[in-house]
Amino acid sequence: MPFRDLILFNLSKFLLTEDEESLEIVSSLCRGFEISYDDLISYFPDRKYHKYISKVFEHVDLSEELSMEFHDTTLRDLVYLRLYKYSKYIRPCYKLGDNLKGIVVIKDRNIYIREANDDLIEYLLKEYTPQIYTYSNERVPIAGSKLILCGFSQVTFMAYTTSHITTNKKVDVLVSKKCIDELVDPINYQILQNLFDKGSGTINKILRKIFYSVTGGQTP
């Protein structure tokens, strides 16, 4: 594992979160491997980062012992950093009235309804006729489905990224600890790959490179 990846990972973490432990690690590694300020800013050319990078060389406390390997939690940390201060929302569909309440999962011709009021059920029966669609009492998988949310203000990142969501009010996309735990599950590798591949900007590009280094893939 290249020591530069370890430096760039911890520096990215410091630049995003101002984590002091990461600053100490970067400072110690740079002193040990004679990495200069100019070396670091070549990876972070945006001027907004430069005053923070200078702190690496002003830091007095250095680590006496350093691991030259990524920790077991590195993948989780990468996902956390990639989604740090993630801010997205879903615009409401004005075809859905404010009076509708409930959750509907539609996959193929199967429909699962939860916590729906009479207005939503009436709407569904008009739009999705029982002659064509099957209304099921069993849960329908959210992944790859159409999700209708009515009367909710938040939805998980996992639901947002794996389904097509329509809502009757503005819905914020929430990244929770549970969501990150689900994302690092090996069965969701493709979702992670898409997440890192879509990232733009200096830090996201670095995180993408380290993601492929940690998971053994090849950076596109």
Swiss-Prot record:
Keywords, comma-separated and alphabetical: Early protein, Elongation factor, Protein biosynthesis
Disulfide bond entries: none
Top-level taxonomic group: Viruses
Family: Belongs to the orthopoxvirus OPG087 family.
Oligomeric form and interacting partners: Interacts with H5 and A18. Might be part of a transcription complex composed at least of OPG087, OPG145, and OPG110.
The protein's role, per its UniProt record: Involved in postreplicative transcription elongation on intermediate and late genes.
Name of the protein described by the UniProt record: Late transcription elongation factor OPG087
Organism this protein belongs to: Monkeypox virus
Gene (name only): OPG087
